[in-house]
Amino acid sequence: MKFSVLVLLASYLVGVNSSIVDTSEELICPDPENPLDCYPKLFVPTNEWQTIKPGQDIPPGLHVRLNIDTLEKEAKLMSADEKDEPVQEVVVGGELQDHSREAITENLQKLHESKHPEVKQEHAHRTKVSQGDLSNFDAACSEIESFKPHESDVERLHLALDTLEELSHDIEFGVKLTSDKAIFQSLVNIANGASDPKITEKVYRVMGSSLRNNPEAISNILTNFDKSYVDNLFEQLANENDVLQKRILGIIQALVQNSHFVRQYFSFDHSSGLNDLIAIFPKLGPNSKSRASNILEDLQLFPVTNDRRSLEDQDPESQVSKFIQNSFVGNKLDEKNFKSYFDQLVNLHQSNKSLRPSGDFLNWLAEEVESRKENKKRDDYSQEDKDFDEYMLRARHEVFGNPMGLRKAIADEL
């Protein structure tokens, strides 16, 4: 949730025993092929706020905050008079006391309710639920983990999810939530079994918020869970409404920020996630289609074109169509995915007549159709192959080109 103010939720103190790192030797290079895009492993503080980059070690005794607008952690040197100044961040200058964590939670709840009165009103209606014992992270997690369908108090579940959704925007709470496999698995179970879509949406919001721009939290999920977690997300996509689809895709979009996850699920060499996203796209709602096209854009599997037409055309269906076309033009698809991707592209253009094929794709399609004529000479040329070759020929003219050209093409075949 985006606030207009900066709120520090840094409820921890960096350990005083952190090792000193030689910055001349210890560098972090996100892109091994770009040595200029490196930064020191040890964060070097100044008197000005600086963003703490992924993987950096932080020296002890700094003033640390979370920028809620950018969801980035920042730090600077602690000034002598800073403790007496009325600031909008909570400064952690020593060991964290229990009441400090409670104060952070309480202030965060008040800030949220002041900006969203409907939340405060909704909570007021739940008179039978004690809010005090579910307003902190540990109590909310305990309620989630012990929840039993048809037995536990659903109103208490709502309160616990509200607390976690609020706190999960903070990077440290996101890390803490994802580091406990039992709690996160409980969230998965609740989402899969809930009959109330409001509960399901809250669960997905908690998951998405805890992972967004939080590399350590993402790493926790990738370590603690197996492929079934990702498979389950895509399975739920087909059965949910647009709101829930968008929430689920928000989780997937957070995960694709991890290069290891992308290589395993969203590369052309390991394309199970990519294939699922393309296959499910026609079943998505309008908002979810936008989120799906954003995921494809985030992957950066193809060079970004800055021509005027590309910049002006941001329609999700057009973006997905271009992605599939580029997959063919770039010869990225293996034999297993070739037919399914082509079928998806044909269906997409048949359902949306405003979509236009690119010149590069039309040239590729013409060459592909011509080259497939040689298949007839093969001894192992099956009826299935023949049917698909004819399907491509018809699609070339009826879907992507001039339908009248099909007559001439068939005549040439004869």
UniProtKB/Swiss-Prot annotation:
Q: Where in the cell is it found?
A: Endoplasmic reticulum lumen
Kindly give the Pfam families that the UniProt entry links to this protein.
SIL1 (PF16782)
InterPro entries under this entry?
ARM-like (IPR011989), ARM-type_fold (IPR016024), Hsp70_NEF-Inhibitors (IPR050693), Sil1_fungi (IPR031884)
Keyword Endoplasmic reticulum in the entry? The reply is yes
What main location does UniProt list? endoplasmic reticulum
An example GO biological process term is: protein transport
**Protein origin, superkingdom:** Eukaryota
Give the residue ranges of motif Prevents secretion from ER: 411-414
Key words of the record = Endoplasmic reticulum, Glycoprotein, Protein transport, Signal, Translocation, Transport
Signal peptide (residue range): 1-18
An example of a Gene Ontology cellular component annotation for this protein is: endoplasmic reticulum
Q: Which residues are glycosylated?
A: 17, 352
One annotated GO molecular function is: adenyl-nucleotide exchange factor activity
Question: Family per UniProt?
Answer: Belongs to the SIL1 family.
Q: How does it assemble?
A: Interacts with KAR2.
Described by its record, this protein's role is as follows: Required for protein translocation and folding in the endoplasmic reticulum (ER). Functions as a nucleotide exchange factor for the ER lumenal chaperone KAR2.
Q: What is this protein called?
A: Nucleotide exchange factor SIL1
The organism encoding this protein is Candida albicans (strain SC5314 / ATCC MYA-2876)
